[in-house]
């Protein structure tokens, strides 16, 4: 039995890794996402049970206390947290994953200097990487959470000489790392590395605007995976290495996909302070130019008539729908329209909202049928034949300036081509700009009608008016 145990544990890890891969594959489609999530959860349970059978485990009581506390907190969070708060939840979970990895590295360092065992170069490097990636993920995710929750301003937060200061701090980390490699039991230097890692995480996310939060959340998710993988090397656990590598790789791929959807490089997201206030006189900036433009507005009754007597309607959800928690009202409106013979579709932009798949998650929670959800590339050719495009709280992702104005900061960004529809109704609180800080040309087109108010209240009014048609 004793001889079989190590082999059995490794085989369990192999099965768990296979379940993770299958789960990731099924998470790629809304129709199979729930099943994929369940497969990944079973894989994680198997990995945890196998690890608990390891003979190196010294204190089961502490482990089970931790599991109990964590499970209770997780269950309460899953029950209490609204779907509209999922970006904040994901940010916190990323941060906790980074914290766990950093604590593993810190614990291993403490063990090595406490037992007097010789510290190898490989030990030191893996511990440094675990502390760096884990620390950056922890504080970076908490800053992202604070921005999403409104505890910190969503706009980029910058200060003079910010990039040189960041560079100096990073150089300081590398210098201290080199010194720790030469003196691997130096506690003062090690604690300094921990502190620098935490500071770097804060400085990394502060200058990033709210419009880039989907990319940041995805990148931090990747970091949490890399941190777990580094922790796996620290404690020589193959399952941690594999699982962390899967999360890290998938997160990086998703980050690149989202950057492509915004027509921006990752470096411009991290260092460009996108979404800050526009300079006066720059193309696309708000100012006197936008004040000279005119727009048309409608009330809920007129908008309901346009929707109710249309043959085809495409709904474009955005962050405004998430903030107003209007997804259930939107589903009810779609049901009413379909009952009158209107064909209803949903157009999803990859970076709409505040996390990857934000709109998909909200619409799934409202039980919107998966076949009605269309990606940007699939729906854009259909706008020419669409009678009414209903924009709910989306801004930059439907701005035609991205296609027509070479001077605009969002020029080249793939958008949902709502301006090609026969008519457009835009539900919005006011005429303010999106996170890119540029005016939206769509709002001033002859075919566009502005319907002002909170998304949830306005959609509820539309439902009531459509019922009366």
Report each predicted region and the residues it spans:
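C-terminal ends of transmembrane helices
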Residues: 18-32, 71-90, 141-156, 200-213, ...
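Structural signature of hydrophobic alpha-helical transmembrane segments
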Residues: 3-17, 54-72, 123-138, 184-196
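Cytoplasmic-side transmembrane-helix entry/capping segments in multi-pass membrane proteins
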Residues: 34-43, 63-66, 85-97, 156-168, ...
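Transmembrane alpha-helix boundary signature
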Residues: 51-64, 76-87, 103-119, 143, ...
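Membrane-interfacial segments at transmembrane helix termini in multi-pass membrane proteins
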Residues: 246-310
């Amino acid at each position: 039995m004793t001889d079989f145990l190590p082999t059995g544990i490794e085989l369990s890890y192999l099965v768990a890794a296979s379940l993770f891969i299958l789960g990731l594959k099924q998470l790629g489609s809304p129709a199979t996402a729930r099943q994929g999530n369940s497969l990944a959860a079973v894989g994680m349970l198997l990995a945890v049970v196998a690890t608990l059978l390891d003979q190196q485990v010294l204190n089961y009581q502490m482990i089970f206390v931790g599991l109990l506390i964590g499970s209770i907190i997780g269950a309460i969070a899953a029950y209490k947290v609204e779907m509209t708060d999922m970006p904040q939840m994901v940010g916190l979970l990323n941060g906790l994953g980074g914290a766990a990895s950093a604590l593993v590295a810190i614990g291993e360092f403490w063990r090595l200097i406490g037992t007097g065992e010789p510290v190898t170069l490989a030990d030191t490097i893996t511990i440094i990487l675990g502390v760096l990636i884990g620390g950056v993920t922890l504080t970076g995710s908490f800053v992202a959470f604070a921005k999403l929750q409104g505890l910190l301003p969503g706009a980029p937060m910058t200060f003079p000489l910010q990039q040189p200061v960041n560079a100096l701090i990073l150089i300081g980390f590398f210098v201290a790392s080199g010194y720790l490699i030469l003196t691997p039991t130096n506690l003062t230097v090690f604690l300094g590395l921990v502190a620098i890692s935490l500071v770097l995480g804060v400085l990394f996310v502060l200058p990033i605007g709210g419009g880039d939060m989907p990319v940041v959340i995805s990148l931090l998710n990747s970091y949490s995976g890399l941190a777990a993988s580094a922790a796996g090397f620290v404690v020589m656990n193959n399952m941690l290495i594999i699982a962390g590598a899967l999360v890290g790789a998938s997160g990086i791929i998703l980050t690149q996909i989202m950057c492509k959807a915004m027509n921006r490089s990752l470096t411009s997201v991290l260092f460009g302070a996108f979404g800050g206030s526009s300079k006066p006189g720059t193309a696309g900036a708000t100012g006197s130019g936008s004040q000279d433009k005119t727009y048309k507005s409608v009330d809920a009754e007129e908008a309901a008539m346009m929707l109710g007597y249309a043959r085809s309607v495409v709904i474009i959800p955005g962050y405004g729908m998430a903030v107003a928690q209007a997804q259930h009202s939107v589903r009810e409106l779609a049901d009413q329209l379909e009952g009158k013979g209107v064909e209803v579709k949903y157009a999803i932009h990859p970076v709409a909202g505040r996390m990857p798949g934000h709109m998909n998650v909200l619409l799934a929670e409202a039980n919107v049928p998966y076949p009605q959800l269309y990606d940007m590339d699939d729906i854009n050719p259909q706008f020419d034949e669409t009678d009414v495009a209903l924009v709910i709280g989306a801004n930059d992702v439907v701005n035609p300036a991205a296609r027509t104005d070479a001077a605009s900061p969002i020029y080249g960004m793939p958008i949902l081509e709502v301006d090609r529809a026969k008519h457009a109704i835009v539900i919005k609180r006011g005429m303010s700009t999106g996170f890119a800080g540029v005016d939206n040309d769509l709002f001033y087109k002859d075919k566009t009608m502005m319907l002002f108010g909170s998304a949830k209240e306005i959609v509820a009014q539309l439902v009531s008016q459509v019922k009366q048609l």
